[in-house]
Amino acid sequence: MTASTRNGSPSPSPAAPTATEQESKSMTTTPANPPETKSQTNGKGSGTAQSSQKPASTSANAKDPLRPRRKKAKRACFACQRAHLTCGDERPCQRCIKRGLQDACHDGVRKKAKYLHDAPNEALLPGIRGNYYNQANTTRNIPNQRGNASNSNSNKVSRQSVSSANFYTPQAARSYNVYVQAKSQQSHVRPAVMQDASMNPSVFHAQSPSSTQNFDLSSNPQTQNLSSAMSQTASSVSGQNQDPFGAAFFDPSHPALFNFDIASMNFGNRYGALEFGMLGHMATGAGDTPPSDSATQRGSIGRSSGTFTAQNFGDSANNQSPFLFGDPVLNDWNPTGQGQANPRNIYNQNAVAGQMGEQNPHAFAIESAPMNFASPSSTESPQMTTTTPFDEANANFSSRTNLMHPTNTPQQSRISTPGLKHQGLHVGVKRRYRSPSSIYESVKEPYSYTSGFHSLTAFIQRRFSPQKTLQIAKALASIRPSFIATTKTLNQDDLIFMEKCFQRTLWEYEDFINACGTPTIVCRRTGEIAAVGKEFSILTGWKKEVLLGKEPNLNVNTGSSLSSASSVRGSSTFTPRNNNTHNSIDPHTGMPTVGGGGASGRTQPVFLAELLDDDSVIEFYEDFAKLAFGDSRGSVMTTCKLLKYKTKEDSAALFHGKEETQQGGVDGSSGTGTTTSGDVATTTATGTSTSNGANANTNGNNTNPNDPSSAASSSASSALQGPQQSPRQTWGKRGIAGEAGMNQLGFRDGKVECSYCWTVKRDVFDIPMLIVMNFLPCI
């Protein structure tokens, strides 16, 4: 049989291929023979594929080694695959053209591997691979591969439309335009997509990148037909249970996946912001995770399960902006500093059809702009701003809204976020942005811990008795060799770096102290206070400026029972060794200094030993000696007694108040307006009243402790006039409430009994850097 006869024959039978085809198959698959065998083979006729590709002069020498090798096709057509012949990449291929089968030439289907047995055929097409997302819509449109020529022709168009309607193509990812079909193909794909009963309209409310693309529904008349068709489809499937999480949520090739606005995320570096954005995307966009309020607290648009109708595309009656995704938070998402635009301009006109029909992956940006959840008034139209400029070509959108008629289909219930629409809820707005770079720029010299330990030693010798001083000295002496061993190799730069580490760690703890409602202080390893919370000041009466050494320390309360009497009458239990080395007041600035150096002296913060009574100080330094170079993660939980802040005037007023109370208890009354009820009485500046209020005298500015207003006023006056509480105060069943109640703690003997927990944090040189302490009063 000649080659011309074979080219004119109909489609070859798969059961009995011709002898020439078998010969061609053997010629294309059998390796080259020895030279003597090749001379015998050259006399035979060449195969069909060789005769179609090579001219007649070279067809007689099919096994010539100098003949250029044919390039293998990526996938053979259906006819060549059945005939086991070599095909080309072009469609239709040359063999089908010569045989008159160009209309039925399409890619053949290979046998799938075992691990791809459950994968649909459309996902295995060339160029698709991992970009297949909507299996439910494509399994119904698998082409009939064994049909006749007319069915194959129609299925070819349907397959091309479906594959392009369900996958991301590389061209779409680069050009941000995923709707790239021609007009002839759009007429075929839209009825098939609209009439498919498995179409899920609720996925159109899923999140999408709100800061990447722009769209306008009016520029393309075909999208208007899409909107009208969508309204009919939504009304027919609104009663069915919808699954908005059918499509994949992660596509690494999507251009908007890593489109994070780094400047608005309050991160100091790009890598931390990208990591946070990716974690937020994975957490809020998970396929099996239902929508929640947490998904919108960082600026992401959460999923909703509402029904997709044409009303989401058209303008409302009050000229309000349409909401494509049905999320009420999208209405208030108004980044500061951006121009106002309409939500319908978020995507471009071609991307809308891609979002609607192609089931793109649900990738979106996290915190793409500073958050502002302020709710607009009922008379204002909701507005939203985007990061893309306003397209002036979309200005005629309002003139074409008559083609989009809203339907009366009731939307399904969705989770709203009314808590976010509160005027006082500004995530990240109230927080003052601080940069730690100022710490590294401001620290120029190391901190003098030597002067701090000298001042601590002088204070301990001045306040404590020799026996108690010896106990504290033994505890500090036990860790002195460890301090020497860790610091002897440090130079000037290391000490400066150590101070920078301390200031940087303290910078982090300031936010913790402000956010925590527990009385907290942070001090150095010398015991000098470095940071304090306002709750601690309320509890003890120590002002923050006094504790940090910015104001003079006039406290005379040392916890001794004779401290107040000694300050008034001038008596003391023992003579201190050095009275002029600590807390000397600078005559020019009025600030406490070290060493009495005047204006050139170093300001001295308050030591931790000044805030505790004698027994608590000894117990603290014994525990500190065990924990300083011991367990780096260890902590101590015990009880202590905090000393209230008292000046000489406070102690004198309290001492005279006790004498008047004793006289009033003997005489029954006094000329200064003192009344008693049993043995409990309180003293004010102009008069006194009983604590229970039963026999209260109305002389002067007497207050009733049971009255909240009077309690607040008494606390305010006590802050200015000193402690005014009797030594025996009883509390009711309600206990202590508010600042006033905390101020009244410890007026009996100037001590507040507390339970406290503290730990030691070390620096990079494994040296104790700071001590963090939390207190809770025992009521």
Swiss-Prot record:
User: What CDD domains does this protein map onto?
Assistant: GAL4
Sequence ranges of Low complexity compositional bias: 227-238, 560-572, 672-719
InterPro entries in UniProt: ERT1_acuK_gluconeogen_tf, PAS_13, Zn2-C6_fun-type_DNA-bd_sf, Zn2Cys6_DnaBD
Q: Which GO terms describe its biological process?
A: cellular response to starvation; gluconeogenesis
Please provide, alphabetically and separated by semicolons, the GO molecular function terms listed in this UniProt record.
DNA-binding transcription factor activity, RNA polymerase II-specific; RNA polymerase II transcription regulatory region sequence-specific DNA binding; zinc ion binding
Residue ranges with Polar residues bias: 25-61, 202-226, 291-322, 333-344, 401-416, 573-586, 720-729
Q: Residue ranges of region Disordered?
A: 1-70, 135-163, 202-239, 285-344, 401-421, 559-590, 655-732
| Key words of the record | Activator, DNA-binding, Gluconeogenesis, Metal-binding, Nucleus, Transcription, Transcription regulation, Zinc
Where is this chain's protein located in or outside the cell?
Answer: Nucleus
Q: Which Gene3D superfamilies match?
A: Zn(2)-C6 fungal-type DNA-binding domain
CC per GO annotation: nucleus
Looking up Pfam families in the UniProt record yields: PAS_13 (PF24990)
**What role does it play?**
Transcription factor which regulates nonfermentable carbon utilization. Activator of gluconeogenetic genes.
Give the similarity note.
Belongs to the ERT1/acuK family.
Q: What is this protein called?
A: Transcription activator of gluconeogenesis BDCG_02812
The species is Ajellomyces dermatitidis (strain ER-3 / ATCC MYA-2586) (Blastomyces dermatitidis)
| Species classification | Eukaryota, Fungi, Dikarya, Ascomycota, Pezizomycotina
